[in-house]
Amino acid sequence: LKRTTQLITGALLMFGAALMQAQPAHATVVKNSFLKTQRTIRTYNINKHAKLTLPKGTVVQVAGTKHLHGNKYVDVYVDRLSYNIRKPLLSVKKPTIYSHWIRAKGDNFKQIHKPSYLSYYAAQSDGKQSHGKIRTETGNLWKGTRLPVDYATSVAARLRVTTNGYLEYDASSPFVFKISPKPTTSLKVAKASQPMASGKTILTFKSRLKQLPFTKKSKGHYQLTITNAEAGTITVVPNTSKVQKILTNWIFKVGKQSWYENNSVTTFK
C-alpha cells in the first residue's frame, strides 16, 4: 500500500509539473495586470490615430483583454506611461488612453508583479464598481486635502509615478484631462521600497526635483517618501441639496506636505 501511495503521489507531482509547463505564460493576465515588454513594440493607439513605441523593458498596465482565433490580446494604458511614450497622443484630435490590441505572447511580454514604486496606491483596484461607486485609482496625487467642487475648471499641483517608473510633477495641471499633459519636470526612479506595515513608499533617485521635499542621503542619492496618512475627505458636487456626485479623497504625506488622491466617485441620477 505504501509503495502504491508513493507511485500515485509521484504521478500526481509529474502531472502537476506538466500542467504548469503547459499553462501559457499569459493565462493569468487580466485587466490591471502588469507586464514588461521583451522587445521594442511598435503599435498605435486604439483607433490608430497615433503611432506609439514601447521600448524593450517598458512596464505597462493592462487595460483589457480579448481572445481572437485562440490567441490572447491585450491593450495597455498608454496615458499612464512616461511623457516620451505618450507624447504622440497629445497631438491627435481624438486621443484615446489605450493602445491598439497586442498579442500577449512570450516574445512580446513577461508578466510581473506590481512594481514597488507604485505601492503607494491601489493600482489594481482601478475601475472596480460596487453599489454605484467606481474606484478611480490612477496614482495622481494633488497638493492639498480635498478635491475642489469646481474641479472641472480648476488646476493644481499634481504628481504621479508612471507605470514605467518616472516621477512626474506638474505645477499647474487641470483636474480633468484625457491625456496627461507634458509635466513641468520628471525624474527616473532608481529604486523603491515599502517597509512592512509602515504605510510608506520610499522612492530613491540619483538627483532631485526642487519642487518636491526630497531628502539627500549622500551624493547622487536622494529620497522622496510618500506616506499613507490613513485619513480621507469627501467632495460633494454640487454642494447644495441636489447632490450629483460624491467623490472621496485619500490623503498622503509627501515629506511633510499633504497631498491626496481622488480614489472613488459615486454618481446619482
Placement of each model-derived feature along the sequence:
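Sec-dependent N-terminal signal peptides of Gram-positive bacterial secreted proteins and lipoproteins
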Residues: L1-A27
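Beta-loop motif signature
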Residues: H26-K269
